[in-house]
Amino acid sequence: VFQVAERRRAQLRELAASYGRGPDVRSVAVVGNKPLDPSPERARAVDDCDLVVRVNGFRLDDEGDAPTYGRRADVVFFNRALRATPWFFAGYRDRLHLLVEPGRLHWEPDSIPAWWPQDLGQVHVDNDDLTIPLSRDLGLDSTAEGLWATTGTMAAWWARSTFPDATLHVAGYSFVTEPDQTRWRHASGDDCIVGPEHRIALESALFRSWVLDGRTTIWP
């Protein structure tokens, strides 16, 4: 079983790298969806990475925009509650879409929304490879408690654990400085509540702990 899981994770790593700049991934950017002020330095740091990961209803810089969010999206983490933005399906055939399914541990049906493109080609990420070990790092029990990390934290944890020798650039995560918030504000689209299944103060602490080893940068 262990060998099967290792092979599955290795295959996903190779697949993800094929959507970036090359097989040798030495830098990864993971961008969440909080509203950001323009920053040419941050946008350049994101777009200069070997692999750029986005989350759910993400936003990209368009032609003529002040550099803020960056313009690349190689891998997209998302869930069935997706609120698609104008950028999500634009050029979707050139991206790897990774569908996280923590709710399948309890109540979520194994169905695909009819409004998604039939050729989206999403890869379903095994909970044994992502949800459960990440929850363990957070001190949560997803199987017994019905609690799990946000999709954004899943994306960042996956990037960090899948490419352990790469530098990690993280931007767009409001809970790093606002761990007690109860609503999400988004770079595009309406705000919404923080789901009751999340414990974002624990996620905030996890992100801040990553900075200590010197290979993770959290951009304001």
Located regions from the model:
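Metal-ion/cofactor- or nucleotide/acyl-coenzyme-handling active-site neighborhoods
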Residues: 1-220
